[in-house]
From Swiss-Prot:
Entry GO MF terms: RNA methyltransferase activity; rRNA (uridine-2'-O-)-methyltransferase activity
Record lineage: Archaea, Methanobacteriati, Methanobacteriota, Stenosarchaea group, Halobacteria
Protein name: Ribosomal RNA large subunit methyltransferase E
Subcellular location: Cytoplasm
GO cellular component term of the entry, any: cytoplasm
Gene: rlmE
Length: 259
């Protein structure tokens, strides 16, 4: 553990990153492609700024990066495209300031927030889940359809419930422990890609009118502007359906009459 810790600590000093945690985001992005040129990124729990540096590098000159932490974040040599907010993300005022700084929406929300450690594992785990849920709520508020999410959480009894809630929000979800994490750490990162913004949920039942036909012959219905593909339905049909799968901009449904 010590050798790996020293490796990333020394590497961060040599390469000018403010923390060894910068390599965690690098490795997560290398594996899952959550950051991209021109992206609008919100970084929660951003102090001292290692993740901000990586996000700014990968978003590039056309990107916008907003970092928030209750601790002060020392100004960067170049702040082009980078803004920091000092405050507590559990407070409504801070959340509003972040929304304002991000101009109301973001392509990516990342969170490396962690609780003050007590040494009591169950308590530390519960607090980390609480922070992760705060980050998820921020992602719900800020992410456009197709947006991405990365959040740190300590493994434990409440993890699966949190994971299930994240899976409800994103088309792709994975967990990963990057090499830059310490060997003895229980931290995991959950990656959610392609945020689903839909007026419906999987399992919902609806009566819909088929208004068009897709390239593969599926019927197309629209619910509050959201596109729903329905098997074995023709334009002009009115059918009862069950929603089976949701993507950021479209979903799929099956007819309930078995046609």
């Amino acid at each position: 553990m010590g050798n790996r810790k020293d490796h990333y600590y020394n590497k961060s000093k040599q390469e000018g990153y403010r923390s060894r945690a910068a390599y965690k985001l690098q490795q997560l992005d290398d594996r899952f492609d959550v950051l991209f040129g021109g992206a609008s990124v919100v970084d929660l729990g951003a102090a001292p700024g290692g993740w901000l540096q990586v996000a700014a590098e990968r978003a590039g000159a056309r990107g916008k990066v907003v970092g928030v932490d209750f601790q002060s974040i020392t100004q960067f040599e170049t702040d082009a495209g980078l803004e920091t907010v000092r405050g507590d993300m559990t407070e409504d005022e801070t959340r509003q300031r972040v929304r304002d700084a991000a101009n109301g929406s973001a392509d990516v929300v990342v969170s490396d927030m962690a609780p003050d450690m007590t040494g009591e594992y169950d308590l530390d785990h519960a607090r980390s889940v609480h922070l992760a849920r705060q980050a998820l709520e921020t992602a719900r508020e800020l992410l456009d359809a197709g947006g991405h999410f990365v959040v740190k959480v300590f493994d434990g009894r409440d993890f699966q419930d949190l994971l299930a809630d994240i899976e409800d929000e994103f088309a792709f979800v994975a967990t990963h422990s990057p090499d830059a994490s310490r060997d003895a750490s229980s931290e995991l990162y959950v990656v959610g890609k392609n945020h689903i913004v839909a007026p419906i949920a999987e399992g919902d039942e609806h009566t819909v009118e088929i208004v068009d036909t897709g390239d593969e012959g599926d019927g197309i219905a629209r619910i509050e502007g959201y596109t729903l593909f329905v098997d074995d339905a023709a334009e002009g049909d009115t059918v009862d359906v069950t929603v089976t799968d949701l993507k950021p901009n479209y979903g799929f449904a099956e007819r309930r009459d078995g046609a």
